[in-house]
Amino acid sequence: MSSPQLVAVLERAQSLGHIGPGEIDSYVKHAIAHLSAADPTHGASWCDLGSGGGLPGLIVAVERPDLMLTLLDRSSTRVEFLEQAVRQLDVVDNVEVVEGDATALAHNNLYRGAFDGVFCRSFGSPSATAECAIGFLGGTGCLVVSEPPEVSPQRWPLKSLQALGFAGAEIVDGPPRFAKLAVATPPGLDVPRTWKQIIKKPLF
């Protein structure tokens, strides 16, 4: 059951266009399923990549106050909303909101390899998501990505993932469905590339 404060925050996100149309409760249930698929250890540090309207980050913050969360988004408008939402939900002690380009922040010493896990709901293509996320993950970290309902064996090609530093992709069947990508080896120092390079020449 969603709290009135959380519903109000997500309704505002919806009115601002930060999340799509539909029932708020369905977004909350999806975020809780995302958290369940990730199964973070107590006190772990996680990043919500491209947090947008706070899905799943804000729900995770409410459900798991033991976690240290960083909500990352490049839009100043969305970041302003997230900062207000964090105060409204009284989760300021365990949530940091960061504005910036993921491809740049992943090379910042404050964030590179700093997280036990990365949540991602709708950041970009699988290739762009994997390339950006691995820069934020520590040596035993894990990326947990929301997946479309239809199965696509080519969505996460093993050789391409291994070249980045992931062990592969484990699919958590739902509904909803998620992909879990565990780090096997540290990424190269040039990973991730710039957005221009990522878009022009995707890795897969």
Q: Where in the sequence are the language-model features?
A:
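SAM/dcSAM-binding transferase cores
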Residues: R155-F204
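Conserved SAM-binding strand-loop segment of SAM-dependent methyltransferases
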Residues: V91-A102
